[in-house]
Each structure stands twice: as C-alpha cells, then as structure tokens.
From Swiss-Prot:
Homotetramer. It catalyses: a 2-oxocarboxylate + H(+) = an aldehyde + CO2; pyruvate + H(+) = acetaldehyde + CO2. This is Putative pyruvate decarboxylase C3G9.11c. It comes from Schizosaccharomyces pombe (strain 972 / ATCC 24843) (Fission yeast). Transmembrane segments: none annotated. The lineage of its organism: Eukaryota, Fungi, Dikarya, Ascomycota, Taphrinomycotina. It comes from the Eukaryota.
C-alpha cells in the first residue's frame, strides 16, 4: 500500500476490516468482479470473500452477521443482482440493522454515454436501481472520482453505524482502481454517540427521578433497540440498580439477562400470558427502553399502560409522558440516571418478582408422546447453554421461542417486524459466520425453522457446508405454512407444500462429508437427543427433523393470527 495513494477498492475494504468485518458476503457478477480482486490486497488473511447461493440469501446473511458482529457488508451486481437482494435490505432497514450494500455498476464511461447494456431496463437510465435502494437505505453514494471516494466512503459508513440501518454504495467497474488519498486510513473510524446537552439531560434526569419517587409500582419494558444500539450493559445496570420488575417484548428477547432475579417474562399486550399480564399491567410507571412498537411486537398495539404513566428511552430522543426531549440519547442518559438514583429508596418500592418459566405440557388430544408446541419449547430451553446464538424463523418459531427462557449471554435472532418467511436460513449462515469471525468463536449456532419457510431459502445450507460451519438445524415438520393456515385458509391448497422432501439426506445432498441427521417423532426421542453429549458439542453440521401435528401451534401465534385475520377484514 502506498503511503500517499491507495486504490479506491482497497480503501473501501480496509475501512470495512477496521470496523470488524472479516467476511465479505455476496454473489459475483460481471460489474463487480474486478472490485472483488482487491479483497486480497488488504493484506489480512482473516479478511476474505464468502459467497452466497443467491443475493436474497446473501442479504439475509448480512442482516444476521451484523446482529452478531455489529455491522456487515455484501457485494452484488448492477440490476439483476441488487434487485434480488432488496427484500433482505428492506428487512434490515425496518429492523434497524447496519448493512453496507456495495453494488458493482457499469464503468464511468458507460454512465456518461448510456449505451444499451445488459442488466439495464433498456432506457438508458443507469441510476434507476440506486433510486429504488434509496428508499430502503439511510444514505446512498456513487463513486465516480478518486478525489472524493475516501470521504464519501467514510461518511457513508458513519451514517450506517449511527442510524443502524443499511447504506448503498455504487462502485463503477473502473472506479475501484482509481487512486485516492490513503492518509485517512491511519486513523480507524470511531463513531461515539454524541454527548447529550448537559442542561437538558439534567432536567430529564430530575423529572424521571421525581416520577419514580411518586410511583408505587414501577416496572421496565426492554425492546429491540436496546440490542440495535448496543446498550445492553447500560440497561442491565439500570435494572440491577433499581430492582424493578423487568419485561421484554418479542423483539427484546435476550437483550437483557433473562436469568436475572428481576426478569418477569415477555409482555405482548393483550397476548401476554395471563399471570404475567396481570402483573405487568398493574404498574403505575412503565419505563420503556429501546421501544419498537410494531403489531406482532405489541399484541397488535394493545399495551394497557397510558402515555401519562410512560417514559420512553430512545437512541435520539426521550419521551416523558407527553413531553419529547429531542437529542437526549438513552446511551448516555441511562448511566446518568443509574448513578443519580437513591438505590435504597428505589429498591424499597420495587415489587418482588415471582416469575416461573413456562413448563413443558404433555400432548393433549394427540397420541401419547406426540411432540406439541406446549411441550417442545420449554423442553428446548433446557437444551440451551450460555452464549448460544439461536435464530428463529418468522411464524411458528418466532412465537414458540417466547416460551424459552434463555441462559445468560445468549442471543436470539428473529425478524418480527419485517417478517419475511425464509429469512432465518440465510440468517443462520450469516450468524454462524459472524460467530466464527468474533472474539467468541466457540459459541453454538442453532436454527429453528419450519418446513414451509425452509423450502424458500434452503440453498444457503450449501454455503454453510462449503464454509465448514457447524450449526444445529431444527426443522419443524408440520407439513405446510402454519401461520398462514391460522390467519386464513386453514385447509386451503395454497398453504400446502411438497411434503415428500427427504430431510434426512438433505445435508449429504449438499455435499456434507461430516454431518449427522436425526428423525424425531416422540418426546422420548428428543429428550434422549438432548442428553447426547456428542450432539450437544455441535462439532459437525447437524439437522434435527421434529415432527409435529399439522394444526398445532404456540398459544401466542394462535391468538395473534386471530387478531391479524380480524384486522385484515377491516
């Protein structure tokens, strides 16, 4: 690398490595091939290209890699490649996931003369796909000059990190080989959260302390943006200091320590388990940290606590009852609040927590030993270990996992807001890759996916095998799209799938030389498997086919489906 100048592509990849990205995801295409050659020029053997089976799966993988590592990058090609990935980036945008989408586009000469090239719409508009992506990105940039490239790249990466949303970078096929100033690379990018206005922050702390002092039964609700904006420790410190009963939303699962003595369950508005609901809704002051109040995350907007008894902590504002304090970030506010409270006084008013984890219930209305959701999920929870990373699929798995209380340090990856079926398979690959690239590479990666969703994105198991990764894949075989059946069309043909797949040979079919597959029909078979030390080591890729009744479903899914069906008819 020159001490003064560096190739634009080399600059870009060096910056990505400095941010902690070690695997560049994507699919090669003629407009990005020359750029991909520059990955090796970074000069770090841990930094590498890791291809995907298709662009949509790649976007899903980038989403989950970012959840594990903090940020990710994926390279696609102009038009046909980038459009295939857009669904995945829409999910990352809505769920607040920082992904850098790099698109190889026609060279700068073609951009100026606009010939009738392949992968275009045939109308000479070479920016149309960039405009599409601009609606799903926090920012977009087009590199057509070496002079400005470094600045544009750095600004784009800062936006990606600060907003925790995808960004889009168009790189003409010749622009990766333009030269740009190398000197900024001497200073790694660091994006600390700006300090709050001290005067306003002091006012906010005082007002919150006053409301806590006046309350008789305060509680805390932890949501998705605690994880998205990396304030897990600040949130846990606040919980430990106050002893307030603490609930999580579906999107807030594993954002805090669920083995904490102050953890009191999952709150989903009207869909909450009745005993938890009664306790949660008896509060006279609800402190919501990192809220993201979507329909499936809130029981279709059925929170019972009024705004007059609510304080909301967000990444860029704080809301106290009806008053909004712009620019007061929870990242800095929570530690100030924790330091300011009178622990003895505050802890004295904290209601004792008497949380009991869900218990496995044997099958009702089915043959003895049949695996049902009431039994499976609490039983699955007993299999988990500290620091496991569990990816759950949209639909059955996302709702069933709510009955699992996670050990300390676990991470549950889900896509509750966007809800694209098939997401979890690509996400599993990205998560497992992220674990490998992390400071804790020995964590287990576990996927739970239904057979219907698996059929959409199964190809990414091939990439998982090709890269020597060893996740445990649970396939719930219940012969179709259960969540759709419950919403509409219980016995409709459009909710059926091909039920003749041979899951037991799936891993071998994708070329796995070392793998294990299990065909589980009964409670005893699954319990025996969970006791198997070899299985628990997760030293080879494994697939567990779990057979469940067609119309059996988790309680929360059944109730949510009723709400959704009713809403769809309005």
């Amino acid at each position: 690398m020159s001490s003064e100048k560096v190739l634009v592509g080399e600059y870009l990849f060096t910056r990505l490595l400095q941010l902690g990205i070690k695997s560049i995801l994507g699919v090669p295409g003629d407009f990005n091939l020359a750029l991909l050659d520059l990955i090796e020029k970074v000069g770090d053997e841990t930094f590498r290209w890791v291809g995907n089976e298709n662009e949509l799966n790649g976007a899903y993988a980038a989403d989950a890699y970012a959840r594990v590592k903090g940020i990710s990058a994926i390279v696609t090609t102009f038009g046909v490649g980038e459009l295939s990935a857009l669904n995945g980036f829409a999910g990352a945008y809505s769920e607040r996931i920082p992904v850098v989408h790099i698109v190889g586009v026609p060279n700068t000469k073609a951009q100026a003369t606009r010939p009738l090239l392949h992968h275009t719409l045939g109308n000479g508009d070479f920016k149309v796909f960039q405009r599409m992506s601009s609606e799903l990105s926090a920012d977009v940039a087009f590199l057509d000059s070496g002079d400005s490239a470094g600045r544009l790249i750095d600004n784009l990466l800062e936006t990606c990190v600060r907003t925790s949303r995808p960004v889009y970078l168009a790189v003409p096929s010749d622009a990766g080989y333009f030269y740009t100033d190398a000197s900024p690379l001497k200073t790694p990018l660091v994006f600390p959260v700006p300090e709050n206005n001290k005067e306003i922050e002091h006012e906010v702390v005082s007002e919150i302390l006053e409301l806590i002092e006046k309350s008789k039964n305060p509680s805390i609700l932890v949501d998705a943006c605690v994880s998205r904006f990396h304030i897990q420790q600040e949130t846990q410190d606040f919980i430990d200091a106050t002893h307030f009963p603490t609930y999580v939303t579906p999107m807030g699962k594993t954002a805090i320590n669920e083995s904490s003595p102050y953890f009191d369950g999952v709150y989903i508005g009207s869909l909450t388990e009745p005993s938890i609901k009664e306790r949660a809704e008896s509060t006279d002051l609800l402190l919501i940290i990192g809220g993201l109040r979507s329909d499936f995350n809130s029981g279709t907007f059925t929170y019972a606590t009024p705004a007059s008894q609510t304080i909301e902590f967000h990444s860029d504002y704080t809301k106290i009852r009806s008053g909004v304090y712009e620019g007061i970030s929870m990242k800095h506010l929570l530690p100030k609040l924790t330091a300011a409270i009178d622990k003895k006084s505050v802890q004295a008013k904290a209601r004792p927590v008497h949380f009991e984890p869900p218990k496995a219930v044997a099958a009702e209305g089915y043959a003895e030993g049949t695996i049902t959701h009431k039994w499976f999920w609490p039983t699955f929870a007993s299999f988990l270990r500290e620091s496991d990373v569990v990816t759950t699929e949209t639909g059955t798995s996302n709702f069933g996992i709510l009955d699992c209380i996670f050990p300390k340090g676990c991470q549950n990856l889900s896509q509750v807001l966007w809800g694209s079926i098939g997401w979890s398979v690509g996400a599993m690959f990205g998560a497992t890759l992220g674990i490998k690239d992390s400071d804790a590479p020995h964590r287990r990666s576990i996927l739970i996916v239904g057979d219907g969703s698996l059929h959409l994105t199964v190809q990414e198991i091939s990439a998982t095998i090709r890269n020597g990764l060893t996740p445990i894949i649970f396939v719930i075989n219940n012969k179709g799209y259960t969540i759709e059946r419950l919403i509409h069309g219980l016995h409709a043909v459009y909710n059926d799938i091909n039920t003749e797949w041979d899951y037991q040979n799936l891993l071998k079919g994708y070329g796995a030389k070392n793998s294990r597959s299990y065909n589980i029909h009964s409670e005893k078979e699954l319990l025996d498997l969970f006791k198997d030390e070899e299985f628990g080591k997760a030293d080879v890729i494994q697939l567990v086919e779990v057979h469940m009744p067609v119309l059996d479903a988790p309680r929360v899914l059944i109730e949510q489906a009723k709400l959704t069906a009713s809403l769809n008819k309005q």
